[in-house]
UniProtKB/Swiss-Prot annotation:
Oligomeric form and interacting partners: Part of the 50S ribosomal subunit.
The protein's name: Large ribosomal subunit protein uL6
Family indicated by similarity: Belongs to the universal ribosomal protein uL6 family.
GO BP term, pick one: cytoplasmic translation
UniProt keyword annotations, A-Z: Ribonucleoprotein, Ribosomal protein, RNA-binding, rRNA-binding
Gene Ontology cellular-component terms listed: cytosolic large ribosomal subunit
Function (record text): This protein binds to the 23S rRNA, and is important in its secondary structure. It is located near the subunit interface in the base of the L7/L12 stalk, and near the tRNA binding site of the peptidyltransferase center.
Organism per entry: Limosilactobacillus fermentum (strain NBRC 3956 / LMG 18251) (Lactobacillus fermentum)
Length: 178
């Protein structure tokens, strides 16, 4: 049984957490994030510590307790440090470019794939086989990174495709001759 919901969140210097109704707002050096939390969970800010209490003991409320605490903790971490995902393109002729607000992927299809970046996310392409996605919202960064990876997810025989940095691809052996 997890007890993440009972852990307190220590606020670093320069971070403010406020609540209006069910909307939690976190302000920090890198920006501001807002998120709606469930009315079944109450949040209290005492000095530089944030605590969460739940209204009951049924399974839904217990699940929301830990999830809400984790979401607010990710908001605090995002406005202080930010989040970053790095993707690698593996395959002959696979490359990426970033022009304007479009990420252009050449990954073996007949035409290049163009993806528009979300407003909350920053994209860098240091070399044509590496894509760095960063931002203060963990959800937005992870969702966009997953969208990019889904364009050509790694295949198990040669490992070609778009993968996360440090992702291990389970390789299959090909067919053997008679």
């Amino acid at each position: 049984m997890s007890r993440i919901g009972y852990k307190e969140i220590d606020l670093p210097a320069g971070v403010e957490v406020s609540q209006e109704g069910n909307v939690v707002t976190v302000k920090g050096p890198k920006g501001t994030l807002s998120r709606e939390i469930s009315p079944l969970i109450t949040m209290s800010v005492e000095g530089n510590v944030v605590k969460f209490e739940r209204s009951g003991e049924d399974n839904k409320v217990r699940a929301l307790h830990g999830t809400t605490r984790a979401n607010v903790n990710n908001m605090v971490e995002g406005v202080v440090n930010g989040f970053k995902k790095t993707l690698k393109l593996v395959g002959v002729g696979y490359r990426a470019q970033f022009k304007g607000d479009k990420l252009i992927l050449t990954v073996g299809y007949s035409n290049p794939v163009e993806m528009t970046k979300p407003a909350e996310v920053e994209i860098a392409v240091p070399d044509n086989t590496t894509i760095e996605i960063s931002g203060i919202d963990k959800q937005e960064v992870g969702d966009f990174a997953a969208e990019v990876r889904a364009v050509r997810s790694p295949e198990p025989y040669k490992g070609k495709g778009i993968r996360y940095e440090n992702e291990h691809i389970v390789r299959n052996e090909g067919k053997t001759g008679k």
